């Protein structure tokens, strides 16, 4: 199980250490945006709601263009930007990319483009796997993108 409270705290502090300096006005009551290429990211949204029940979630599952794994990196980046624009129109205060493919292909680029915190799931998943292994070995399965 991914510990999203740790992920929100530690990774956001690291990735957005200068966030406060940007003087972004963030409504504490604004929802958190979560997106995936389909419905699998609902498990991420559910865990966020379990660990942070006071938070509201706006979920976007891109079932019209699923799967992302067979798409080019440029296409995944374009889709991610489109979804992020939509989520921003919903007034989200932060975004979680709950799609491994989009996290791998788009996260670093869109972090530089946004004025709100954005995180992916790869780091937290890798950390959880590393903590869970008993023999020091981890298998990784990925998509073509």
Indicate where each model-derived feature is located.
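Intrinsic-disorder-associated, low-complexity terminal segments enriched in Asp/Asn/His/Tyr and depleted
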Residues: 4, 15-18, 25
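Non-catalytic structural scaffold of enzyme domains
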Residues: 23-145
């Amino acid at each position: 199980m991914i510990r999203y409270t740790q992920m929100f705290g530690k990774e956001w502090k690291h990735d957005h250490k200068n966030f406060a300096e940007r003087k972004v006005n963030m409504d504490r009551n604004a929802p958190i945006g979560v997106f995936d290429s389909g419905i699998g990211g609902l498990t991420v949204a559910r865990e966020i709601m379990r660990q942070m029940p006071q938070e509201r979630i706006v979920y976007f599952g891109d079932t019209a263009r699923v799967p992302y794994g067979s798409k080019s990196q440029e296409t995944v980046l374009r889709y991610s930007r489109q979804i992020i624009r939509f989520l921003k129109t919903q007034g989200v205060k932060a975004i979680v990319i709950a799609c491994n493919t989009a996290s791998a292909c788009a996260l670093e680029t869109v972090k530089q483009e946004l004025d709100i915190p954005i995180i992916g799931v790869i780091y937290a998943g890798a950390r959880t796997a590393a903590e869970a292994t008993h023999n020091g070995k981890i298998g990784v399965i990925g998509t073509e993108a």
